[in-house]
């Protein structure tokens, strides 16, 4: 067994032990988010999970916050994107997707996110099926959600319909370090699919948290078709 003898050796030993604990915390949180990321596979469901971190203090006080994943299903604006197949969600299309219906959907989404948080809004909200930056800007700046000051990152996938995934985050609980899209190569003759979103951030306790937002094909056509 190694026993540090001088004050300098003791200080170095404490520093190395502290760094080791921080690395362990990062690994634990990473796997916590992997489990939460699996929940993104369930469309139309809202899944909330509590994540805990420890403050770097003598009391080891726990910091908890809520992580939510939600397939909000076809959050399109009312304008045609010539590069995407979004014709179904236009004012003169079969769904009559006009500005009034669009604003109502924004308000409904904002209301649900706020209600999930109860007294404390979710720190992280993974969203599936958002069309573009415009709808996220409207959701976070022009809906009741604007009071919560969410910021967001999103993918820009080659999906033919133009739907993407995104992550909303509270800046006072999650400091964004990086974000990137992970492309999924088309399999044989299959059409392009949605990218994965990988986001890294820093928690209040100094731990690093990695989040993966995924939106895999539905099984509406059967398991064999989706695979």
What are these regions (language model features)?
Residues 1-22:
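N-terminal secretory signal peptides that target proteins for export/translocation
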Residues 27-42:
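Bacterial N-terminal signal peptides
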Residues 12, 45-46:
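Short, low-complexity intrinsically disordered segments enriched in small and basic residues
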Residues 149-184:
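Extracytoplasmic mature domains of secreted/periplasmic and thylakoid-lumen proteins
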Residues 2, 48-95, 99, 170-227:
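Active-site regions of metal-assisted phosphoester/phosphodiester hydrolases
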Residues 46-147, 153-163:
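N-terminal, active-site-proximal structural segment of metallo-dependent hydrolase catalytic domains
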């Amino acid at each position: 067994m190694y026993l540090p003898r001088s004050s300098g050796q003791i200080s170095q030993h404490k520093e190395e032990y502290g760094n080791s604990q921080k690395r362990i915390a990062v690994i634990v949180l990473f796997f916590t988010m992997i489990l939460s990321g699996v929940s993104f596979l369930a469309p139309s469901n809202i899944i909330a999970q509590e994540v805990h971190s420890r403050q770097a203090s003598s009391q080891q006080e726990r910091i908890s916050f809520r992580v939510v994943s939600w397939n909000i299903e076809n959050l399109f604006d009312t304008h045609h994107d010539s590069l995407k197949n979004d014709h179904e969600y236009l004012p003169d299309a079969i769904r009559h997707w006009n500005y009034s219906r669009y604003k109502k959907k924004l308000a409904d989404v904002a209301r649900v996110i706020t209600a999930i948080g109860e007294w404390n809004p979710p720190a992280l909200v993974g969203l599936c099926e958002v069309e573009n930056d415009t709808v996220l800007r409207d959701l976070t700046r022009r809906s009741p959600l604007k009071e919560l000051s969410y910021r967001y990152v999103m993918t820009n996938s080659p999906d033919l319909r133009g739907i993407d995934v995104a992550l909303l985050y509270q800046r006072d609980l999650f400091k964004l370090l990086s974000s990137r899209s992970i492309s999924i190569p088309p399999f044989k003759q299959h059409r392009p699919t949605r990218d994965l979103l990988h986001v890294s951030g820093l928690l209040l306790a100094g731990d690093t948290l990695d989040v993966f937002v995924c939106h895999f094909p539905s099984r509406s056509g059967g398991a064999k078709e989706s695979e």
